[in-house]
Amino acid sequence: MLTITSYFGFLVAAFTITSALFIGLNKIRLI
């Protein structure tokens, strides 16, 4: 149970970091 929760949290963190980097790159390209 704990391993599944930690793995899900890791996926959420990775997704948020990648999405943030992608949005940042798009903003830099727009400038």
From Swiss-Prot:
Known role: Component of the cytochrome b6-f complex, which mediates electron transfer between photosystem II (PSII) and photosystem I (PSI), cyclic electron flow around PSI, and state transitions. PetL is important for photoautotrophic growth as well as for electron transfer efficiency and stability of the cytochrome b6-f complex.
GO MF assignments: electron transporter, transferring electrons within cytochrome b6/f complex of photosystem II activity
Statement: the UniProt record of this protein carries the keyword rRNA-binding: no
Keywords for this protein: Electron transport, Membrane, Photosynthesis, Plastid, Thylakoid, Transmembrane, Transmembrane helix, Transport
Transmembrane segments: 4-24
Origin superkingdom: Eukaryota
Gene: petL
Location, primary (coarse class): plastid
Record keyword ATP-binding present: no
Gene Ontology annotations of biological process type: photosynthesis
Bilayer topology: Single-pass membrane protein
Protein name from the UniProt record: Cytochrome b6-f complex subunit 6
Subcellular locations according to the entry: Plastid thylakoid membrane
Span of the signal peptide: none
Subunit field text: The 4 large subunits of the cytochrome b6-f complex are cytochrome b6, subunit IV (17 kDa polypeptide, PetD), cytochrome f and the Rieske protein, while the 4 small subunits are PetG, PetL, PetM and PetN. The complex functions as a dimer.
Family to which this protein belongs: Belongs to the PetL family.
Source organism of the structure: Cuscuta reflexa (Southern Asian dodder)
GO cellular component, as recorded: cytochrome b6f complex; plastid thylakoid membrane
